[in-house]
Amino acid sequence: MKKLTYGMVGGGPGSFIGDAHRKAINIDGKATMVAGCFSRSIDKCRETGAQLGVAEDRCYVSFEQMAKAEAERPDGIDFVVVVTPNVSHYPVCKAFLEAGIHVSCDKPLCLTVEQAEELEQLAEKKNLLFMVTYTYMGHVTAKHIKRFIAEGKLGKIRTVMAEYPQGWLAYEGEWGGKQGAWRCDPKQSGGVNCLGDLGTHVENAVATMTGLKVKRVLAKMDVVVPGRVLDDNDVVLVEYEGGATGCYWTSQFAIGHKNDLRVRIYGEKGSILWEQENCEKVTMIEYDGTEVVRYRGAPGIEPGAAAYGRLPSGHTEGWLESMGNLYRSFAECVEAKKNGVFTPDMIDFPTVHDGAEGVKFVHACLKSNEAGNVWVEL
């Protein structure tokens, strides 16, 4: 079978996330990168392209030029991967959708609710696939929880506690480097830092695992580190449709925490604990207090989730494999589209709709915070 081809916007010199996407796509070998606009500097773009084996004539000076040229080529790319700072997600994604090219975009989807709704509508109008890479939901154990809860095995959800603390931005100018600089810059991040970077992952993790839809939020967004202008610590109270409640905490100055996304879900029949830094296992407490631990690669994992496992139990799979799982499903759907056999039930990745829900969540939190920490409907 001929491999799919893709291009990348962003992901030039020093880009952590661009390199991660390329490695994740390579895990299953379903697509090859053949084009890119890796930097606003054409010299840096060509330098990166040469390092990655991309022909010079497919290293573009702008994303607009790339979208137009690739759409016109008989061998044009099948999809584009957008890994730029937040501020440019919307124009880049829009350009490729208008050119008829499937899109994978890093989160958050964009900066405003209006932009999110436009991208969602445009993808639907053009009949194009659009993935937003909430990477952690590619973990086998996260997929297990989603299926376990959907089958009613936890009963009605009563409350959710979720947190995502990091400590890498505990001091202004320390550790962050290039990655911290743009996140803390309102012009590049869109006026929100911690909540847009970490809070969107929390919102998506809970929504994906539980199926709960946020009804309203009450948020307190703090700016704590001296010299910083955007939030670096957030606490959000959540009420879901149906009456369940939740509490989310995200922080970038929580010294001692690295990438500590955790979700605790409490239902009528028991509870579930999932930890991103210990993502090989799921801990479940049954109604009578019995603790049941399920491990990726071992018996007890829901079959649809277990199918994404690559290695025997005890051979650790992690973050790159999780993103690779998202790209496995995305590539299979793109291939099915090309062959005229695609059906919506094939989708097993976060879509533009999920990305739009994340943007709406962030903006409701902003409104709540600005109004003095009051309840705001989504």
Regions found by a protein language model. Give the residues of each.
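Redox-cofactor binding/interface segments in oxidoreductases and associated redox assembly factors
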Residues: 38, 82, 105, 162
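Glycine-rich, aromatic-lined ligand/substrate-binding cores of catalytic
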Residues: 198-271, 275-280
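A structured beta-alpha segment of the ubiquitous adenosine-cofactor-binding alpha/beta core
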Residues: 58-77
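Predominantly a Rossmann-like dinucleotide-binding segment in NAD(P)-dependent oxidoreductases
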Residues: 129, 136-228, 236, 282, ...
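C-terminal glycine/acidic-rich active-site capping loop/insertion
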Residues: 235, 240, 269-349, 353
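N-terminal Rossmann-like dinucleotide-binding module
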Residues: 1-54
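Beta-strand-loop-alpha-helix segment that lines the small-molecule cofactor/substrate pocket
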Residues: 79, 85-137, 152
